[in-house]
């Protein structure tokens, strides 16, 4: 099987369609020759030949300008990894909670009321401490304050309710080796039209970070 042959294209069509189901997105036809990564909604799925961390870095590197300010609350190792990646590509307000302590939603609301953040990014299911963030409540806050919402769902997609459309998440990342019980070294991203338009605008204006 070659990467450009019809058999591989059939595999990718079925993979794209299955991923849309895992992300709770509108279904697509698992048929070669159609846009199996798109459905009857605002999202596309992208398969990544790399880890969940690589996929998350792709999202961050392509979505933000170097002078954008993002808000990243953390309460464990993997959230802190998201904050560290953001520090390489944009400006970060890092709300660092004690490991194992839930986010203070009132504090997040107060931060978003400042109106200075381009995006809020969270690790949905923080496996280093066993804490799952209230993504629905945080997404609602982001919508109220016109702040984009990006979700590291590496260990939540396929294992607990994740609703990109309802949450208006610009991007959600999953790692194949976690809840979907696939091989390590493969990841996927669900992105909406706002994310895609922003990436193109940044690139067209010559402000992009080194991108993937």
Q: What positions do the PLM features span?
A:
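Conserved N-terminal alpha-helix of the aminotransferase class I/II PLP-enzyme fold
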Residues: 1-58, 77, 81-85
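Conserved active-site segment immediately N-terminal to the catalytic lysine
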Residues: 164-177
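Active-site C-terminal subdomain of aminotransferase-like
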Residues: 177-212
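Active-site phosphate-binding strand-loop segment of PLP-dependent enzymes
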Residues: 103-156, 171, 179
């Amino acid at each position: 099987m070659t990467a450009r042959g019809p058999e591989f294209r059939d595999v990718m069509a079925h993979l794209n369609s299955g991923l849309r189901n895992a992300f709770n997105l509108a279904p697509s036809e698992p048929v070669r020759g159609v846009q199996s990564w798109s459905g009857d909604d605002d999202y596309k799925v992208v398969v990544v030949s790399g880890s969940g961390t690589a996929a998350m870095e792709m999202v961050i590197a392509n979505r933000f300008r170097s002078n954008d300010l993002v808000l990243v609350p953390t309460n464990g190792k993997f959230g802190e990894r998201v904050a560290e990646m953001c520090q390489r590509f944009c400006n970060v307000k890092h709300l660092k909670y004690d490991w194992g302590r839930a986010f203070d939603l009132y504090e997040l609301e107060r931060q978003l009321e400042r109106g200075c953040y381009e995006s809020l990014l969270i690790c949905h299911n923080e496996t280093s401490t066993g804490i799952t963030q209230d993504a629905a409540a945080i997404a609602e806050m982001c919508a109220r304050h016109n702040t984009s919402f990006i979700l590291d769902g590496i260990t939540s997609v396929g294992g607990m309710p994740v609703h990109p459309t309802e949450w208006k998440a610009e991007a959600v990342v999953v790692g194949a080796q976690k809840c979907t019980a696939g091989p390590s070294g493969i990841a996927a991203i669900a992105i909406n039209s706002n994310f895609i338009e922003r990436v193109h605008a940044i690139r067209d204006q010559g402000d992009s970070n080194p991108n993937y």
